[in-house]
UniProtKB/Swiss-Prot annotation:
<feature type="binding site" description="axial binding residue">
    <location>
        <position position="162"/>
    </location>
    <ligand>
        <name>heme b</name>
    </ligand>
</feature>
<comment type="function">
    <text>Destroys radicals which are normally produced within the cells and which are toxic to biological systems.</text>
</comment>
<dbReference type="InterPro" id="IPR010255">
    <property type="entry name" value="Haem_peroxidase_sf"/>
</dbReference>
<dbReference type="Pfam" id="PF00141">
    <property type="entry name" value="peroxidase"/>
</dbReference>
<dbReference type="GO" id="GO:0004601">
    <property type="term" value="F:peroxidase activity"/>
</dbReference>
<keyword id="KW-0408">Iron</keyword>
<dbReference type="InterPro" id="IPR019794">
    <property type="entry name" value="Peroxidases_AS"/>
</dbReference>
<keyword id="KW-0575">Peroxidase</keyword>
<dbReference type="GO" id="GO:0046872">
    <property type="term" value="F:metal ion binding"/>
</dbReference>
<dbReference type="InterPro" id="IPR002016">
    <property type="entry name" value="Haem_peroxidase"/>
</dbReference>
<comment type="similarity">
    <text>Belongs to the peroxidase family. Cytochrome c peroxidase subfamily.</text>
</comment>
<feature type="region of interest" description="Disordered">
    <location>
        <begin position="276"/>
        <end position="312"/>
    </location>
</feature>
<dbReference type="GO" id="GO:0020037">
    <property type="term" value="F:heme binding"/>
</dbReference>
<keyword id="KW-0349">Heme</keyword>
<dbReference type="GO" id="GO:0042744">
    <property type="term" value="P:hydrogen peroxide catabolic process"/>
</dbReference>
<dbReference type="InterPro" id="IPR002207">
    <property type="entry name" value="Peroxidase_I"/>
</dbReference>
<keyword id="KW-0479">Metal-binding</keyword>
């Protein structure tokens, strides 16, 4: 057990959990980033609810949300870290895991401060439906992200997280990676989005996405994919200039992503001038069993229809 407050020790142990032979592309890094993202992206500025406080995915109301399907793996991978450092809250652990994963996969350093607390029951878990739906378009992205307090530039910067990981048909309904090296943080997502010919494809489950098939690729190689929301970034006149800038300038993208992600994981957190959290509506909670639905190997896919996606 480490000394309370030894976050460097926690960082080291998170980094030690990244290598996962047999899991997606051999790395837990992308799922740690998604865990930090989804645990923070429920924030609603108007009501000041949701956000990175609480670790609500420990409860069925949030953890069982189909939008969070697959994140049970990320939470399980971090349990040995929690057991070794029982003083850290889940909400701090999950957000820190995303920060460490991005840095370890070659991404920018992201400011992170501790102090989040965990819900002791599910009474403050935010309602479902606050996370982005990849089957939608530009209007949906603005509705979701403006609600949290982000602008168009920050929306595009955060979308660069799609340099990491892959989609799974039994989770989101979509299938495949965005880039050829989904465990290395880069600006490749933006380059591919602009330069490749993305063709619509309807999967066997009825979900529509966009794919690029390299004619020179080996037969066993998986085609790359883009979500309808990704293609909307390319086609929207206000989003596209940022896509173009990030495709050309990796350093600019890294700088903007770092700032936007730091803002994301602070949503719902109030601090004084010293950085101490001043939220008073929460106390530190203990361990809670993983939610039933999201404790299964895979969760149910989000409801999508080819007809709705085709309208984008």
């Amino acid at each position: 057990m480490s000394k309370p407050g030894d976050y460097n020790a926690v960082r080291r142990d998170i980094a030690a959990q990244l290598k996962k032979p047999g899991y997606d592309d051999g790395s837990a890094g992308p799922v740690f980033v998604r865990l930090a993202w989804h645990s923070s992206g429920t924030y609603d500025a108007a009501s000041d609810t949701g956000g990175s406080n609480g670790a609500g995915m420990r409860y069925e109301a949030e953890g069982g949300d189909p939008a969070n399907a697959g994140l049970q793996h990320g939470r399980a991978f971090l349990e040995p870290v929690k057991e070794k450092h029982p003083w850290i809250t889940y909400s701090d652990l999950w957000t820190l895991a995303g920060v460490v994963a991005i840095e370890e996969m070659g991404g920018p350093k992201i400011p992170w401060l501790p102090g989040r607390t965990d819900f002791v029951d599910d009474s403050k878990v935010p309602p479902r439906g606050r996370l982005p739906d990849g089957a939608q378009g530009a209007d949906h992205l603005r509705f979701i992200f403006y609600r949290m307090g982000f602008n168009d530039q920050e929306i595009v910067a955060l979308a660069g997280g799609h340099n990491l990981g892959r989609c799974h048909a039994d989770r989101s309904g979509f299938q495949g990676p965005w880039v050829n090296n989904p465990t290395r943080f880069s600006n490749q997502f933006f380059k591919l989005l602009l330069n490749m010919e993305w063709k619509p494809k309807t999967l066997e489950n009825g979900v529509s996405q966009f794919v690029y098939i390299d004619p020179e690729a080996e037969d066993h190689e998986e085609p790359l994919m883009m979500l309808p929301t990704d293609v909307a970034l390319r086609d929207d006149p206000a989003f596209r200039p940022w896509v173009e800038r990030y495709a050309k300038d990796k350093d600019l993208f890294f700088d903007h992503f770092s700032k936007a992600f730091a803002k994301l994981i602070e949503l719902g957190i109030q601090r004084d001038a010293s950085g101490k959290v001043t939220n008073t509506d929460n106390v530190k909670g203990g361990y809670h069993s993983a939610p039933k639905k999201s404790d299964e190997p895979t969760g149910p896919p989000r409801p999508h229809t080819a007809q709705r996606a085709a309208k984008l």
